[in-house]
């Protein structure tokens, strides 16, 4: 039987990006947010990326003694979290104002196209091109490679990205998790409402899907996290983007299966203002918003071929920015 909710089990998660391969930036991000006090860090299921994340965590552990759990993201099918953008730069007219370059939050676009390692699939560039030259492609770990990857990486936790209508595929992924016998502290199930379907999905559809997945996971005896993905990978960094996650939590939070509840998908520094202090989730996950405020500092270090933590003053500034960003979730009302 899966353990039920422990009211003291509150946490903050940093999302580095399920398709983010920017190893140098990931090392810096993990160092910064480990120092700032996050409880989990979620990265792509790739050995070199996990190695970079651990290097950043280890640096901060020596100085700040915090030790977040390491989570990897996997998917049971095609998913917007597992994509990248591409275009042929030879087709760009010389006179183009390059709106794609201006909207990219990770500076992945230049005159040579899109740097694969820096693109995490946010989608902001897809509709910015006046000639519609930019397309997306899938970047995902195959089910055939999942077991061996888990055994090599040995993460503390796994997050399975799923969609309402993918129960069979979800079942196969869980079967692989069972077979590889990797010891996990938690399993997170990330799902939201996919409005690209011909028939709009409703919160009750999501609730039914999560209970179906609970029945499949119930025999594993591993604590579960239900991640309500409000506005997944919208590419929108406006303060109001967190409303969808909060509304979803208010609608179905009390009826979810046993486990812990986490908000994601558009979460940012304003999310706490939208929540009722008497009805808070167990966890909060930050992706684009947490990375965006660090990107200029990280880019400065990388231009000079250094890690950000090799600049003590700038690293100190980055940690203070991260602490301020996380401050509402570190307060007694949340923790």
Where are these regions (language model features)?
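Surface-exposed amphipathic alpha-helices with a cationic face
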Residues: 2-6, 54-61, 105, 174-182, ...
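Short helix-terminating capping/connector loops at secondary-structure junctions
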Residues: 6-8, 62-69, 182-184, 218-222
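Active-site mouth loops of central-metabolism enzymes
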Residues: 9-25, 74-94, 117, 133-143, ...
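Conserved mixed alpha/beta catalytic, RNA-binding, or beta-rich assembly cores of soluble enzyme
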Residues: 16-21, 25-27, 38-39, 45, ...
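Glycine-rich, positively charged N-terminal anion/phosphate-binding segment
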Residues: 27, 46-64
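Conserved, mostly hydrophobic/aromatic
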Residues: 33, 53, 158
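Non-catalytic positions within long, well-ordered alpha-helices that form the structural scaffold/packing
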Residues: 34, 93, 101, 105, ...
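Iron-sulfur cluster-binding cysteine motifs and their immediate structural context
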Residues: 96-115, 124-141
């Amino acid at each position: 039987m899966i353990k039920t909710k422990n009211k003291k089990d509150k946490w903050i998660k940093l999302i580095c990006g399920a398709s983010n391969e920017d190893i140098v930036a990931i090392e810096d991000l993990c160092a910064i947010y480990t120092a700032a006090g996050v409880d989990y860090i979620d990265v792509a299921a790739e050995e070199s990326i996990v190695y970079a994340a651990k290097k950043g965590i280890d640096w901060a552990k020596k100085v700040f003694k915090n030790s977040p759990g390491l989570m990897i993201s996997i998917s049971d099918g095609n998913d917007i979290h597992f994509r990248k953008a591409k275009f042929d730069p030879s087709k760009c007219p010389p006179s183009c104002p390059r709106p794609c370059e201006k909207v990219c939050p990770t500076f992945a676009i230049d005159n040579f196209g899109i740097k694969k390692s820096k693109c995490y699939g946010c989608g902001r560039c897809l509709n910015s091109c006046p000639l519609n030259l930019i397309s997306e492609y899938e970047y995902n770990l195959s089910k055939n490679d999942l077991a061996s990857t888990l055994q090599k990486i040995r993460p503390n936790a796994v997050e399975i990205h799923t969609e309402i209508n993918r129960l069979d595929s979800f079942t196969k992924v869980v079967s692989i998790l069972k077979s590889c016998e990797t010891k996990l502290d938690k399993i997170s199930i990330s799902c939201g409402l996919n409005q690209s379907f011909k028939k709009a999905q409703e919160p009750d559809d999501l609730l039914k899907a999560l209970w179906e997945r609970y029945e499949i996971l119930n025999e594993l005896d591993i604590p579960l996290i239900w991640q309500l993905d409000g506005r997944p990978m919208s590419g929108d960094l406006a303060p109001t983007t967190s409303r969808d996650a909060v509304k979803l939590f208010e609608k179905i939070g009390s009826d979810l299966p046993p486990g812990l509840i986490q908000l994601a998908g558009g979460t940012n520094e304003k999310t706490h203002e939208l929540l009722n202090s008497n009805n808070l989730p167990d966890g909060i996950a930050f992706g684009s918003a947490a990375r965006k405020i660090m990107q200029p500092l990280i880019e400065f270090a990388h231009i000079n071929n250094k890690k950000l933590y090799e600049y003590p003053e700038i690293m100190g500034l980055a940690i203070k920015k991260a602490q301020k960003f996380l401050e509402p979730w570190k307060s007694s009302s949340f923790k």
